[in-house]
Amino acid sequence: MTTLEAFAKARSEGRAALIPYLTAGFPSREGFLQAVEEVLPYADLLEIGLPYSDPLGDGPVIQRASELALRKGMSVQGALELVREVRALTEKPLFLMTYLNPVLAWGPERFFGLFKQAGATGVILPDLPPDEDPGLVRLAQEIGLETVFLLAPTSTDARIATVVRHATGFVYAVSVTGVTGMRERLPEEVKDLVRRIKARTALPVAVGFGVSGKATAAQAAVADGVVVGSALVRALEEGRSLAPLLQEIRQGLQRLEANPGLKESSKKPLP
């Protein structure tokens, strides 16, 4: 299944696509794979975070998960093996979230090539402004990986135009300026950010940072997709099942007022 097909399928069902985020190797190697099996029935796409020692864009929940995964021995090689195992479980698009340093440490061509071979669909690069290293972005695309970059409510229209010119797969709209984390309500600026991005690209737009339940999912569902990370990682940290949270979020994504023009008959039962 391609990325565009995954978003189109969700849209045909009258909802935004659900993109769960899980940290590779957290809470353990086996626990990660169990979590993947739990989220896959609800997921349209899946985002896998590569643990990193200095995750500037991540809030405390994901920082703790990364630290624990690294202490337990998770590495780029370990993440490669996990991506390969996840790919054996699903045909849904798989995106690797990675900071730039591991890419440079392994060598971009080797890093991108190995993750493509392992089954990754694309890479999300939160700390790479694409216009600062267009050659690296082009290399990833030539190898066959889609490239996803972040835009924030503070992004200017000129910045949006630059980023979408380099993006493939989808565009990641950050709901708040700051780090990842759970919030009770998303700022109203997220609607305007999605509108401004969609005015400049035909690519799907996914909103992330702050989605923690049905209400925030409904707010974020003005976009084509919604990324849920910290809330899932916190549930894993606390030893809770992920299914109740995923069911609640899927209900929020199904709200027709967040998807104008859809008919009642387009609704489908949740998993």
UniProtKB/Swiss-Prot annotation:
Reaction(s) catalysed by this chain's protein: (1S,2R)-1-C-(indol-3-yl)glycerol 3-phosphate + L-serine = D-glyceraldehyde 3-phosphate + L-tryptophan + H2O
One Pfam family hit: Trp_syntA
Active site: E47, D58
Disulfide pattern: none
GO molecular function, one term: tryptophan synthase activity
Gene Ontology CC: cytosol
Pathway in which this enzyme or protein is active: Amino-acid biosynthesis; L-tryptophan biosynthesis; L-tryptophan from chorismate: step 5/5
Entry keyword set: Amino-acid biosynthesis, Aromatic amino acid biosynthesis, Lyase, Tryptophan biosynthesis
InterPro entries named among the record's database cross-references: Aldolase_TIM, RibuloseP-bd_barrel, Trp_synthase_alpha_AS, Trp_synthase_suA
Organism superkingdom: Bacteria
EC number(s) on file: 4.2.1.20
Protein purpose: The alpha subunit is responsible for the aldol cleavage of indoleglycerol phosphate to indole and glyceraldehyde 3-phosphate.
Subunit structure: Tetramer of two alpha and two beta chains.
Similarity field: Belongs to the TrpA family.
Stated name of the protein: Tryptophan synthase alpha chain
